[in-house]
Amino acid sequence: MSVIDIFKKRLQAVSKKPVIIFPEGWSASVLKAVEMLNESKLIQPAVIFHNRQEIPANFDKKITHYVIDEMDLTSYANFVYEKRKHKGMDLKEAQKFVRDPSSLAATLVALKVVDGEVCGKEYATKDTLRPALQLLATGNFVSSVFIMEKGEERLYFTDCAFAVYPNSQELATIAENTFNFAKSLNEDEIKMAFLSYSTLGSGKGEMVDKVVLATKLFLEKHPELHQSVCGELQFDAAFVEKVRLQKAPQLTWKNSANIYVFPNLDAGNIAYKIAQRLGGYDAIGPIVLGLSSPVNDLSRGASVSDIFNVGIITAAQAIK
């Protein structure tokens, strides 16, 4: 069963469907996905428009929608100001903040008016995630994961979209975020590899040391996982049993790793795209982990189907 089917089943089982807001109401692709999500009855989509002229004639007005030019944004601006004044934001800046659709969406999530947000078809990643980080950060390190699927195979690649140069502690937290996410999907057996250009001491260098320490920090927190987590490993040793027996005979895994923790964004981002384009894997994500409520970023090349799927994922994340 694909991860999208798992999430659909979870959403079918809850009586109160999560409300997920899509702030890019001027995007035809977003509106088509919203229409499909509304028809699915799995979530309650909501949309933000700048003005009434943006609303297409065929838009279903029964779908919850916000028109910024017609809203009294005072209470939202006051909320943002109180949240951000310690960082130097003044009231005028807060008023400007909530007039931006992505920022208003994050505000509605923070106020629990809605349960989650999907954005990024028109916005750059930084403009989707910055408001979310400003209002929904928990103090924990925020990271992301791609679910890579091919047939019945499911792998988790992290972090391929968010953390540029994580240090050892951040890398351990990235691993923990993804481990917890995979467990939430009821993965029967988790094998996690902290990846490097070295396998268990075959190479030396600062980057190797970082990965070794990250593995150590993770296992200090989860000593029960010593048989399931290993680092530092090269990808071929983590993925191919024959190579693993040669390079790391002391590692007694019966199955290959299904969580791959990359040492930096360069490695992770390149790897997931190679797996997608050359390996034929479906890349589902990036799924943002570590916020108080779910906010997920679309690729600007996202199809209607991609937007639909991210809406399903975000709604499933919102289920408490």
UniProtKB/Swiss-Prot annotation:
This is Phosphate acetyltransferase. PANTHER family: PHOSPHATE ACETYLTRANSFERASE (PTHR43356:SF3). Pfam families: PTA_PTB. One of its GO terms (biological process) is acetyl-CoA biosynthetic process. It is found in: Cytoplasm. Keywords: Acyltransferase, Cytoplasm, Transferase. It comes from the Bacteria. It catalyses: acetyl-CoA + phosphate = acetyl phosphate + CoA. One of its GO terms (cellular component) is cytoplasm. Belongs to the phosphate acetyltransferase and butyryltransferase family. Pathway: Metabolic intermediate biosynthesis; acetyl-CoA biosynthesis; acetyl-CoA from acetate: step 2/2. Its EC number is 2.3.1.8.
